[in-house]
A protein has these predicted regions:
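Feature activates predominantly on carbohydrate-active enzymes
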Residues: 2-14, 18-21, 46-194, 198-202, ...
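C-terminal functional modules
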Residues: 371-544
Length: 544
């Protein structure tokens, strides 16, 4: 099974590691995969055919190793979805498709980063940018040389990235303490960039985000008329040295103002003062943007003289979003945005394992903006990341209650549908039916909790990372049992309104207070609003 014909030694070696990670190739793989060269294809392109049925066969045409690597993703999808492809041209929309470890909070471990590179490649990404906000080397100790241990770890990341077709980039953020007019501070950051260059890094980041918006040094105040002027001077000076070091180097700048309409004074002046060869990072209208669209990208280009390099703050859930769990699919990113963007980096959560769910959907969008379907992509991400169907069904129910985010989508589609059905039943004089609806959902939720908490659950890391939300999920499940009990004993007045007791009101009030005392966000605000309506109706019956 999985006889690879015509592949290079490098491709053959990678294929062995790929099928070890994806068991479907071992249980239901292809009898033969024929690999051939097609020099007319772009580096990341491939032509892929998969024949399913009793005699599974496949073929890959590619011009480079990268084309072969990404073609495997399509064959994997063909097996997992049982959908054959015929001479399919597999080609990405966005040329730069990246993950940036740029969140506040506990940085990922080295082991997670190494595993992440394989996952990112499975999702179609080709960049990983190391820029953890709370790791001292990134923002606080930037004037000191990087340690040998750190450089060794980055070297390991580069090697693993190369195997997976993912380029590793590194960013430094000196803005908290830098003196922009001091040539020594240009030299200081170049010490690090030279160290990184010596181990193979060619893509760098210079970040000036989340720093004081005024000049802090007397020398800087004397030399520059504005913070923008200081920033552009310093960035251009560093870039001149980086180019001198190696013409293959590139540098991405994250500006002080990294979101807005792109018509603001700082970003327009900064962009126009910046060397046009520098990439300029932008997060959209907001720090965490509900949407990214073509029209805003065009404005950015017109005003700053730079094509935006998007840093999308999703699924990150740091700072004010700590009580949310961002596990939904990416939405609100316009089709065709790649035609007006230098590239796209997704900023994940510190919860490495659960970040992979949304990152998988982002990879799908970046590869094919026209064909991207958020819900289809999300369901596939679960199938890709969790083999056990029973475990997958249980965790799916939990995760579908955690869609609340800056994307402003339905925070809990299935739960809201249940609430709507139950409230319609009691409002139309059928409280017993409403009780049954709520009771059925409650039982399912508590069964989900039992499955996820079992010793046999196949993804214990998912359980650990979602523990806060799982705990509240269980609390809601138990609360629904009490609500079902109330509804089952409610009467119906002659005008079809519910009639209940003062004890019912006390119970509902207690449930709301208990659930609201836990700030963990799950199911949005729908349950609390529904319980408020139920209490109001019972209260009205007691006073009428």
């Amino acid at each position: 099974m999985n006889n690879l014909v015509g592949a290079t030694p490098e491709e053959t070696a990678f294929f062995k590691s790929f099928i070890d990670r994806h068991s479907v190739f071992l249980t239901a793989g292809f009898s033969e995969i024929a690999v051939s060269e097609n020099t007319k294809l772009e580096p990341e392109e491939s032509l892929v055919t998969s024949v399913l049925g009793s005699q599974k066969k496949a073929s890959i045409e590619r011009s480079t190793y990268a084309g072969f690597r990404y073609a495997l993703n399509l064959l994997l999808k063909s097996l997992l979805t049982n959908v054959a492809v015929t001479n399919h041209k597999h080609s990405p929309d966005f040329k730069l498709r990246g993950v940036i470890e740029g969140f506040y909070g506990t940085p990922w471990t080295h082991e997670q980063r190494l595993r992440g590179l394989a996952h990112f490649s499975d999702f179609g990404f080709n960049r990983y940018l190391l820029a953890p906000k709370d790791d001292p080397w990134h923002r606080y100790d930037w004037r000191s040389a990087l340690s040998e241990d750190f450089l060794n770890r980055v070297s390991e990341l580069i090697a693993e990235g190369r195997k997976n077709g993912v380029t590793v980039a590194v960013a430094i953020s000196p803005g908290l303490t830098v003196e922009y007019s001091d040539a020594h501070d240009v030299s200081a950051i170049m010490v690090r960039f030279k160290q990184l260059h010596s181990i193979g890094v060619r893509e760098f980041g210079l970040f000036l985000d989340d720093i004081p918006a005024r000049l802090q040094s007397e020398k800087d105040s004397a030399k520059f008329d504005s913070i923008m002027q200081a920033h552009s001077y310093y960035c251009n000076a560093v870039w001149a040295e980086l180019k001198k070091l190696d013409s293959d180097n590139s540098l991405a700048i994250c500006p002080l103002q990294y979101h807005g309409k792109a018509t603001e004074e700082y970003i327009t002046e900064f962009g126009n003062a910046l060397d046009p060869d520098l990439a300029l990072i932008w997060t959209g209208r907001e720090i965490c943007s509900e949407y990214l669209d073509v029209s805003d990208a065009k404005v950015f280009k017109a005003k700053t003289n730079h094509i935006p390099l998007y840093w999308d703050n999703y699924p990150v859930n740091d700072v004010a979003m700590l009580h949310e769990l961002h596990v939904g699919p990416i939405e609100g990113r316009e089709k065709g945005l790649h035609n007006h963007s230098l590239g796209y980096f997704a900023n994940p959560m510190d919860r490495f394992e659960l970040s992979l769910i949304s990152l998988s959907t982002i990879g799908d969008y970046l590869w094919d903006t026209q064909g991207y379907d958020a819900q289809v992509s999300w369901e596939y991400s679960l199938t890709l990341l969790m083999d056990n169907s029973g475990d997958r069904a249980a965790i799916r129910n939990l995760l579908r209650g955690c869609f609340e985010s800056c994307l402003r989508v339905n925070p809990a589609p299935d739960f809201y549908a249940m609430l709507e059905e139950a409230s319609f039943s009691w409002k139309t004089g059928k409280p017993a039916q409403a009780a049954q609806i709520v009771e059925t959902h409650s039982k399912q939720m508590l069964n989900d909790v039992a499955t996820i908490n079992s010793a046999q659950f196949s993804q214990p890391h998912w359980r650990e990372e979602s523990l806060k939300w799982l705990t509240k999920y269980e609390a809601v499940g138990k609360a629904l049992q009490e609500i079902a009990g109330i509804l089952s004993t409610c009467g119906v007045s002659k005008n079809s309104n519910l009639s209940g007791t003062k004890a019912d009101l006390v119970t509902i009030t207690s449930i709301r207070a208990s659930l609201n005392s836990d700030p963990t966000r799950i199911f949005g605000s729908g349950l609390d609003m529904t319980l408020a309506e139920l209490a109001d109706e019972i209260r009205w019956s007691l006073t009428s």
